[in-house]
């Protein structure tokens, strides 16, 4: 079951994202997330709580995703409402490998169609090949790269109907 988040879900969102941060750190995976950047006082500068959706497995929070209709950081040329954007997709390790990422991506695709929007976009670390393969297997097409400070390269992806 996928549920749109509300104020009561903030700690759940933080917990799912923290699980991902710990796993990435343990596996020495380069990423932009850290313990501070997944706290709500930071996230709330960029997201509203209802941008988040939580995936539950047998009543247990397993994963989350943020879906927005504007991304000025990576896609400033796209007017608001012309595309949806996936952010903060994270699956708790105990639920990894069970198709939950794909379930959330498909949820985002259906949400875009429901809103009359024919594209879905995302960004991820250029070096995270396994993550990139997940997105490509879900029909996303590589649309370029963006270099951030500290030579941190992001891969940009788009899915069209």
Show which residues each predicted segment covers.
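Conserved GNAT acetyl-CoA-binding A-motif
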Residues: 105, 112-124
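Conserved N-terminal entry element of GNAT/NAT acetyltransferase domains
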Residues: 1-11
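C-terminal "cap" of GNAT-fold acetyltransferases
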Residues: 118, 125-129, 136-138, 144-161
